[in-house]
Amino acid sequence: MIIDTTEVQAINSFSRSESLKEVYGLVWLLVPIFTPVLGITIGVLVIVWLEREISAGIQQRIGPEYAGPLGILQALADGTKLLFKEDLLPSRGDIRLFSIGPSIAVISILLSYSVIPFGYRLVLADLSIGVFLWIAISSIAPIGLLMSGYGSNNKYSFSGGLRAAAQSISYEIPLTPCVLSISLLSNSSSTVDIVEAQSKYGFGGWNLWRQPIGFIVFLISSLAECERLPFDLPEAEEELVAGYQTEYSGIKSGLFYVASYLNLLVSSLFVTVLYLGGWNLSIPYIFIPELFGINKTGGVFGTTIGIFITLAKAYLFLFIPITTRWTLPRMRMDQLLNLGWKFLLPISLGNLLLTTSSQLLSL
């Protein structure tokens, strides 16, 4: 059977179009996955640069200045160096637990970003239990730290892992009533609904003014969850060498630092969402979208404004934990546990009781 040349060309063009469709489908499948990862990575690099510059200013010294303009690429250079360092394994440790621990710590924190709204309808998963899903996911990270400490077969590492687990439990409990109080005020546990509830009265509608006690407790608890000074007892250098990180080197050691800064950024973003109005500017800016002919809550321009406002609030809030790290001394372990169980927990429960009573009286 003789096939015409035109038919052959048509078949070839059809096969090419089908292969192109498969390639496009694969690209569009990977874009939603790698775009948030790329954004989070850039956010962590910015935090590292900010911390180095702020700490240099506090200590009256010069920060990083050689790697890129103003030293902004120094964190990228350090990460690249860690990639090529030797990955040492403890000879008498549990290799499986030792290797899995850092991954659990990083992945559990990355999952928290799925419920954070960066703009109007710009959230990976708008769940009705968004804030409580974050609390549940964040409680998985200490398991990875405990596995790392136990798998290292080192007394300093194991003590650091135990401290991390005890500290996380002690400050997760007072943090939960603060989040529950916000949910009662907003009549929802969805992060998007909580931001929308704060947009009704502009700047005065922020939960920061309606829940000042809860905000302070949430701030202290989130700093303890991030293991930042004065709450960095799981990795206290003078006592435990480096805590659960003592036996780690190379990329696995870098994963712990990434997890620390990821957790810090997550806490700042949740402070922005729960207490600082989220993506809402809280200042009338209707003339800006009208000037460009774009709706305030829709379109590329409105989405970009929402992302910028959310990140600006989060990074401005980051000055508090960065400054406290370089100004306050470390607490003792008994002081840390007493602060969580005997001070913050009763205050957070009392704040929840007051919030519940006010909501019942307003019905």
UniProtKB/Swiss-Prot annotation:
Enzyme class: translocase
Primary site of residence: plastid
Compartment list: Plastid, Chloroplast thylakoid membrane
EC number: 7.1.1.-
Catalytic activity: a plastoquinone + NADH + (n+1) H(+)(in) = a plastoquinol + NAD(+) + n H(+)(out); a plastoquinone + NADPH + (n+1) H(+)(in) = a plastoquinol + NADP(+) + n H(+)(out)
Keywords: Chloroplast, Membrane, NAD, NADP, Plastid, Plastoquinone, Quinone, Thylakoid, Translocase, Transmembrane, Transmembrane helix
Protein's recorded name: NAD(P)H-quinone oxidoreductase subunit 1, chloroplastic
Source organism (scientific name): Liriodendron tulipifera (Tuliptree)
Gene for this chain: ndhA
